[in-house]
Amino acid sequence: EEIKVEKLDINISSAQGLLYAHGALWVNINGKNAGVHRLTDTNGDDQFDKDEYLKPMQGGGEHGPHALVLSPDKEHIYVIGGNHTKLPKTDTSVVPTNWDEDLLLKRLPDARGHAANIRAPGGWIARFDKDGKNWETVAIGFRNQYDMAFNIDGELFSYDADMEWDAGTPWYRPTRLYHVTSGADFGWRTGTGKWPQWYPDMLPPAYDIGPGSPVGVTSGLGAKFPAKYQKAIYCLDWTYGTMSAMFLSPAGASYTAVREEFVASSQMRMTDAVINPYDGAMYYTVGGRGGQSELHRVTYIGDESTKPVKAKSANAADRKIRRSLEALHKPESPNAVNKAWKYLGHNDRHIRWAARIAIELQPTSQWQDKALSEKDTQASLTALCALARQGEA
């Protein structure tokens, strides 16, 4: 079967994010003219002839601007920046914007100076509308997540990097799969400043994978694979040439995961993967750092059904509660304090998180007295955490 490769007649390079949506090719450039561009064909000749530089970014290299992904409802485009990419000015933020290092003990920076001067928010995820406007900060506290994907429930997942030189230290954090919810902070801080996952104001991973170099992430939805593999999230590791199929199980308002090695070869430096909606095959690329670039295809051969999956996951009620609270993640949200307060003592960490963020985004004058007088132990701890983060002594 002949593969046709057509070089686009466009004056851009170093694109680490590519997305065709809404009649345009959206490009996130990592290098000269870094940031988000929109390429369109204005005269119908099947060539992109217009380049709109929508959002400049400061940052580059392997920790620079990364992936672009379309939301399930196709109304938003999500964009990633690694921890060497300064978060550009956004119009709104569902993350409270007074982030800081929040360290009690003196930090030891990396002995070789890596990211020694990088401070919060670290790596980030933002989104903008289909016109390239109305930018909003979604989550922070990553190290260097290249890519992301939505699962069958419309929930977002990303695969974050470790700092390999930290291996064996108490502050080492392995590469990990994150369930990225509204207003999340995953606690990356440079050097020894990384937050442990028991901190109440950071969210834990869905799964710790181990040493590696995270690159592409994709959902199996649309693949002509058995149902289990259609529902999986695939995480690609450049260093070890491994693609992991992550099988998600609902756990309250979030998920846990089980990992299966799906494709592996130490000779293949995998970079990204995608499901082709026309033939139902998975395609993945290999290359990087001057190595040979390749395109590979994965298809299923067997007797299991490959009908498209439609069933949603269990625990929909918990996710519904969390999402109703996330709808309050905006300043001056009417009645947000009263609506969210009863969930501050919930036994699910992600529901408590969503409730606390909704409250933190409101003026403290609306809820400081409630926080100081709350009697329920768990609700009191969550409310006082919010007050410690947002109140003024």
Regions of interest found by a model, annotated:
Residues E1-A327, A358:
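Beta-propeller domains with acidic blade repeats across secreted/periplasmic ectodomains
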Residues G287, V298-A393:
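Long, ordered, helix-rich scaffold segments
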